[in-house]
């Protein structure tokens, strides 16, 4: 898993797996899911992140109980 933030685009992307992109699904005006050919989720893009999440909170991300 990889989380990236593009300051210029004000977009955050959470990549769950590598794979060949096939299509995306728009969830709302700020959330897009990328899918592979079998409709497995490759990642999720969040737009206008700074308007929805305090950027200070992106500096420290804790991952707990993933496995």
Task: Spell out what each predicted region is.
Residues 1-67:
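Small, basic N-terminal interaction modules of short regulatory proteins
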């Amino acid at each position: 898993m990889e989380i990236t933030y593009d300051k210029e685009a004000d977009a955050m992307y959470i990549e769950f797996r590598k794979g060949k992109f096939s299509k995306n699904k728009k969830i709302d005006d700020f959330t897009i899911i990328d899918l592979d050919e079998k409709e497995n989720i490759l990642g999720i893009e969040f737009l206008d992140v700074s308007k929805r999440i305090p950027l200070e909170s992106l500096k420290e991300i804790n991952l707990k109980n993933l496995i």
